[in-house]
Structure formats: C-alpha cells, structure tokens
Amino acid sequence: MDEKVFTKELDQWIEQLNECKQLSESQVKSLCEKAKEILTKESNVQEVRCPVTVCGDVHGQFHDLMELFRIGGKSPDTNYLFMGDYVDRGYYSVETVTLLVALKVRYRERITILRGNHESRQITQVYGFYDECLRKYGNANVWKYFTDLFDYLPLTALVDGQIFCLHGGLSPSIDTLDHIRALDRLQEVPHEGPMCDLLWSDPDDRGGWGISPRGAGYTFGQDISETFNHANGLTLVSRAHQLVMEGYNWCHDRNVVTIFSAPNYCYRCGNQAAIMELDDTLKYSFLQFDPAPRRGEPHVTRRTPDYFL
C-alpha cells in the first residue's frame, strides 16, 4: 500500500483507538506487520534522546493510559519511552497495546516501546490477554499477531548515554551494555538466562545476587547496581515491574528508580501512578496521577491468580 494512503488510514485507526474502540482483525494484522519492519531495525539497547517521558507498567488500564497522555502530553507532542507490560490484568489490553503499537508505527522517532515480562506467549495465556482476545475477536489470531510482534520489541533503552531503561533489572550474566547488544532477542522470553533476567529481576535491600521469589530472574543489591552503573558510565537505572504505592520509588542510593504507571492497579490496589519527565539536560521530575473515572467494567468471568508478576 502507498505510504501516504497507509498514514491516512493509520490516523483513522488512532482516532478510533483513542475512543477505546478495537480495530478489526485484518487491521491488527497489517499494523503488526508494519510494526515488525520498524522494530527489527531497533537495537537491544535502543538509543533515545532527551527530552523524554519515561513510563512503567500500564497493564491494559486503557482509561488510565488516556490520563497518562492527558498529564504527560499527547503523542507525538511528547517523546515517550514505555518500559513494557502493556497487557494482562486490566480490562482493555487489546485497545491499550493496539494504540501503543499504532503510535509507534505512526511516530517511530517519538515513542519507544520496550518488552516487559508480560509481552510473552506463556504469561498472556494465564493473566488475561489471551482470554480477552478470544472474547473480543472470537478466535486467537489477534493474540498470535501481537505475541509474534512482542519478539521484536527492544529489551532496553539508553537515554543520552546515561540513563539505562528496562522492564525488570540486572543479570549476573551481563556486565556491559555490549553483552546486551549481542543477545538474540527474536524469541519467546526464555525461562532463564540474560534475556529473562532483564525482564524479571528486582532490586533488593540485601547485597549481591539473590534467588527471586518470582521464580524467574534474580534480586540484586546496591553493590551490583553501583558496579554496573560505574562500569557502563551510567547515572541511573530506570525500571518498572514492581507495584510502588507512590508511583515511583528510589532505591540503592538513587542508583535505581522504579516507575509504575498503572494507578489503582488491578482496580483495587489503591496506588498512585507516576511517569518520569527527563528534560533536555536530563533533569528529572515525576508526575503522579490517580485513576481516570471509568465507565462500567466489562464482565470478566475467569478470575486470574493473585500473584503479582
């Protein structure tokens, strides 16, 4: 299809998605094919220029994503970096991930979308995205288009050579950013190893490496963060993956910050959400927000396990 014609169509899709109306199956298919072409050119450590606004987990909370854009600025006016976990748990995973992918295809230089541990075939079959696709489309094709696309998402991003952004955390198999650049990311998230760790690990108060209670990834202490940042010339590791009640949380003597962008997570946790604005000198400020007023919830039949991934 002619590029101009596609762009016009894409703008109509984005308009529709902004009203929380899903695309057709065939539209999703062509969107995902286009997105693959763009993402395949991106690095495992995708370079991003400031100013940029960094966001954590969204988890299918579509109306809260709208609130995020209201507070942080519309795309493409604001340059965005999302650190994964677009789907599962919330009621609108389909609309949420479709919108973010559509914005990526339309404004590729102004939005970066990384992979989270929920951007996986296995996890989405347990925590809601698979069932939602089935319910909204009557088959699993859309789930397949998206989960195939997830394999192409960059694992990490580097803002102006200084702020390292990723979903989960560090890995005992990785000392340098070059180690990450050398990984083959075009696969389902493995159960162990460096790629798994980047999407699953958590910072901890205890020093060194520890066994993660999540059953994947590791816990890592302040000594690990400091060593990693120093070795790679970084000032900060910015990550998501954990519910924090204020929406953001510093740890490891400000070597690590956690950002969580799903307010009142799972519609019951009572937390605030936050995003981190980095200006053109890399000065940061946090914007906190509460849930957007919601319409009536769709009826969801299956109750998912209560484990916070």
From Swiss-Prot:
Belongs to the PPP phosphatase family. PP-1 subfamily. Mn(2+) 1 binds at residues 57, 59, 85. Mn(2+) 2 binds at residues 85, 117, 167, 241. The keyword Iron applies. Inhibited by the interaction between PPP2R2A and ARPP19; this inhibition is enhanced when ARPP19 is phosphorylated. Inhibited by the interaction between PPP2R2A and PABIR1/FAM122A. Keywords: Centromere, Chromosome, Cytoplasm, Cytoskeleton, Disease variant, Hydrolase, Intellectual disability, Iron, Manganese, Meiosis, Metal-binding, Methylation, Nucleus, Phosphoprotein, Protein phosphatase, Ubl conjugation, Zinc. It is linked to Houge-Janssens syndrome 3: An autosomal dominant neurodevelopmental disorder characterized by global developmental delay with onset in infancy and additional variable features including hypotonia, epilepsy, brain abnormalities such as ventriculomegaly and a small corpus callosum, and autism spectrum disorder. This is Serine/threonine-protein phosphatase 2A catalytic subunit alpha isoform. Its EC number is 3.1.3.16. Catalytic subunit of protein phosphatase 2A (PP2A), a serine/threonine phosphatase involved in the regulation of a wide variety of enzymes, signal transduction pathways, and cellular events. PP2A is the major phosphatase for microtubule-associated proteins (MAPs). PP2A can modulate the activity of phosphorylase B kinase casein kinase 2, mitogen-stimulated S6 kinase, and MAP-2 kinase. Cooperates with SGO2 to protect centromeric cohesin from separase-mediated cleavage in oocytes specifically during meiosis I. The modification Phosphotyrosine is found at residue 307. InterPro entries: Calcineurin-like_PHP_ApaH (IPR004843), Metallo-depent_PP-like (IPR029052), PPA2-like (IPR047129), Ser/Thr-sp_prot-phosphatase (IPR006186). It is an enzyme of class 3 (hydrolase). Changing residue 60 to V: In HJS3; uncertain significance. GO terms for molecular function: GABA receptor binding; metal ion binding; phosphoprotein phosphatase activity; protein heterodimerization activity; protein serine/threonine phosphatase activity; protein tyrosine phosphatase activity; RNA polymerase II CTD heptapeptide repeat S2 phosphatase activity; RNA polymerase II CTD heptapeptide repeat S5 phosphatase activity. PROSITE patterns: SER_THR_PHOSPHATASE. It comes from Homo sapiens (Human). It catalyses: O-phospho-L-seryl-[protein] + H2O = L-seryl-[protein] + phosphate; O-phospho-L-threonyl-[protein] + H2O = L-threonyl-[protein] + phosphate. The keyword Nuclease does not apply. The gene is PPP2CA.
